[in-house]
Curated annotation (Swiss-Prot):
Keyword ATP-binding in annotation: yes
Membrane topology (UniProt): Peripheral membrane protein
Protein's UniProt name: Cytochrome c biogenesis ATP-binding export protein CcmA
Subunit details: The complex is composed of two ATP-binding proteins (CcmA) and two transmembrane proteins (CcmB).
SUPFAM superfamilies, alphabetized: P-loop containing nucleoside triphosphate hydrolases (SSF52540)
Gene name tied to this protein: ccmA
InterPro entries: AAA+_ATPase, ABC_transporter-like_ATP-bd, ABC_transptr_haem_export_CcmA, P-loop_NTPase
Species in which this protein is naturally found: Rickettsia bellii (strain RML369-C)
ABC transporter domain segment(s): 2-195
Residues reported in the UniProt entry to bind ATP: G34, A35, N36, G37, C38, G39, K40, T41
Major place of residence: membrane
Amino acid sequence: MLSFHQLKFNIYQKQLFDNLSITFLDSAITYIKGANGCGKTSLLRMIAGIMQPSNGNIFYKNLNINNIAKPYCTYIGHNLGLKLEMTVFENLKFWSEIYNSVETLDAAIHYFKLYDLLDEKCYTLSSGLQKVVALARLIACQSDLWLLDEVETNLSKENRDLLNNLIVMKANSGGIVLLSSHTENHIKSAQILQLT
């Protein structure tokens, strides 16, 4: 379970949200929607512990996220978290070791069909393939909370379908997935959190 209690966030003297209280139960898929600048990315970054709210608390599994050892979630944002000078395999191995989940590395490579790219330096890949390598972390790094910030950008239809299937599988296994998106909701069973 993930919950916000009276969350408030101001940036550059602009209030993005005030007194935001909501609970996401296990197995939830939620699209965070809203206009540019309404706080979608900021909210995901706060849940990930990268930013702090101006006021209020965020709880995951009934613990304040400030008191949980990191990493407790997998966050993929605009900065994909790739070491561009490293190979695809080195990047995935690096992240799986941080999450103590090396045993899932092969599954990540197989699911996103990365075999032919394993020895490629990430800087040689297109932005779409770099995004796929970052998304492979969802399998390589075992966590029950996924925070995905506009991850469908630059993805082929095939990889978008793989991602959506993976999100549904994560929710079906009890995980929580929050994703911001400017595109149509591809997962019809997902709920919508509209920020204004």
